[in-house]
Amino acid sequence: MPSVADKSSVAELAQRAAAILLDRKANDVVLLSLEGVSDMTDYFLIASGTSDTHVRSLGSSVMEDMKKQTGQVAHHVEGLSQGRWVLLDYVDFVVHVFHPTLRNFYQIERLWADAKVVPITVGASR
């Protein structure tokens, strides 16, 4: 895992995960910088799948491709078998993949309204 002091590497890893989600047709992909807002992590990456199967597939793809491309392994994983809300904790960034109904219900972007939206770099996974 990159050190907390290595902010550019963390940003690059979060961008790479975003590109993986976009490559797998995730919807409404948003990257939030939590710098100055929270001490628990640097970034939240939020996306939606179109169905339980798509949500599971997106979560699995991020885990597999991040390990293959960067050697990064999620420290903690939740919700993968259900496919409603998958959480992948990479310590310095956290990936949330939602079924659309749950994303609408929890409105996680509103909970973190003070966080800065970071533009996603197209092609970060290449």
PLM-predicted stretches and their roles:
Residues 58-63:
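Short amphipathic alpha-helices in soluble, non-transmembrane regions
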Residues 65-96:
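Mid-chain, well-packed structural core segment of small domains
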